[in-house]
Amino acid sequence: MPKVAFLGDSISAGLHLAEDQAFPALLAQRMRGQPHAFRLINAGVSGDTTAGGLRRADWILKQRPDVVVVELGANDGLRGVPLDAIERNLRGILEKVRNAGAVPVVLGVRLPPSYGKEYVTGFEAIYPRLAHELGVAHVPFFMEGVAGAAEMNLEDGLHPTAKGHERLAANVEPALREAIASVKRAPQQP
């Protein structure tokens, strides 16, 4: 059974929810007993940034995942991290994943317009550009139907409720199924 790691922030971690209510666990539950079933490695860390994810990538790759879902960048954007640094870190993560023989999937993130048109536009362009340049799977906006929907988020307006996580799982599932199906790794060494 393939191993799927989620390298993410508080959204992957399921902040303020039970572990089995976070979208990575929901995806594992949905696919259990199916051809796309997988073992979950949830490496979501609340508050994590692309720089933190890049530092943690080697540790995650030591666990030999077949697929790595990268859900990072929101905390960078909310802190106004320079766009070139965000892109460099995401590129580094995706290249490490691919070089380790795993299939990367990058989840696109968006920012509120209050961060300024130039920054927001530049930020949102990073994900599809990297997906295209590196040839990796990409979910354009994995928070579609959740971001900005009060009934899908906790009182902070940033972190999804259990219902919101169900929608995230539905948004990510097609790309994850495709990534699992494409796993063509060489036999792992003992």
Predicted regions and their residues:
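Serine-esterase "nucleophile elbow" of acetyl-processing enzymes
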Residues: 1-46, 56-64
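Alpha-helical cap/lid subdomain in secreted, periplasmic
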Residues: 36, 52-190
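N-terminal helical cap/lid subdomain that shapes the substrate entry/recognition surface
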Residues: 47-51
